[in-house]
Each structure stands twice: as C-alpha cells, then as structure tokens.
C-alpha cells in the first residue's frame, strides 16, 4: 500500500511542477495537445467563457455529460484576500465530466476506480494572461494505480476521448 500512496502523492504534485516549468507558445502557432507521461495540456487564447462553452460542446459531442464546474477562483480569491496573499489567477475552474456507459464498465472491473472519477479538466487563466490553459491527468497514467487490464483498456478509450475533446477545442479557438 505504501507504494500506491507514494504514486498517488506524486500524481497530485506533477501537474503543478509541469505547469511551472512550461513556457508559453509563440503567437500564431498551431495549438496542439501537449502530452507528457502524466498530463494532457492545451493552451488557447480567448475569453474563459468561450473556452468553457467550447469544452462543453466538445464533451457532449463525444457522448459525455458535464457533471459540474467548480469555481475555485471565487473561493481561493476570497481566501487569499483574508490571508493578505496574492492570488495568481484571473480564473481557475475545474470542469467534471463523465460517460455513464464507460463509468459502469469501469466500476464493474474495479470499484476502486470511483476514486478517480469523474474525468476532470483544470481550466485556468494566469493573472494578466490572454491564454487559457486546460489540463487533464492522463487516464492511462492514473489507471496504473489499479493494476487491472480491463481498467487500463477503458482508460485508453477515455484518454482517446479526452484528447479528441481537447483537439476539437483547439480547432475551434485560436
């Protein structure tokens, strides 16, 4: 169990470390989904509401539904003000989405999979930036924690869908 706990702790830190190390893309370049071992990252330009709408449309086109949007920026901005600290984001949302058929198959394969559900996208704008960054954990990376061939197969399918969703958004926005 210790190994799994360490792996899960590493999973939570990796998005932060990767994003701190990333540079921004050049103006006018074709936006594509950046793939690391752990993450899928897309950066686009535009108002966050347009990006969220494009994401919701793409999610529905892949037969998923949006389970909710957590507006972390509102709460964290108030908390930062209470502590007298700066808040480094103009916007920070977590968009949750799910495909019920795949969720059912996954939970039948391993009920522990529920700890990783639903799919989530961090959608944020750094203070003063015109770019919106969208980040997802790679389902194939997370699925390794469960060591189930069926879960890994489903994770590959979900990951292909997440990449397709991000590619649709990249095609629709600058």
Predicted regions and their residues:
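Bacterial N-terminal signal peptides that target proteins for export
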Residues: 1-10
């Amino acid at each position: 169990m210790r190994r799994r706990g360490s792996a899960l702790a590493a999973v939570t830190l990796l998005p932060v470390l990767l994003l701190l190390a990333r540079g921004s893309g050049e103006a006018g370049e074709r936006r594509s989904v950046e793939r690391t071992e752990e993450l899928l990252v897309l950066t686009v330009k535009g108002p966050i509401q347009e990006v969220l709408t494009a994401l919701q449309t793409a999610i529905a086109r892949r037969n998923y539904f949006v389970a909710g949007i957590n507006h972390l920026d509102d709460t964290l901005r108030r908390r930062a003000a209470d502590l007298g600290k700066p808040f480094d984001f103009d916007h920070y949302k977590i968009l949750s989405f799910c495909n019920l058929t795949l969720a059912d198959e996954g939970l039948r394969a391993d009920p522990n999979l529920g700890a990783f559900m639903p799919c989530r996208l961090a959608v944020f704008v750094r203070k003063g930036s015109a770019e919106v960054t969208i980040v997802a954990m790679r389902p194939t990376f997370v699925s390794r924690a469960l060591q189930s061939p069926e879960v890994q197969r489903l994770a590959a399918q979900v990951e292909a869908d997440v990449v397709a969703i991000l590619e649709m958004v990249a095609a629709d926005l600058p």
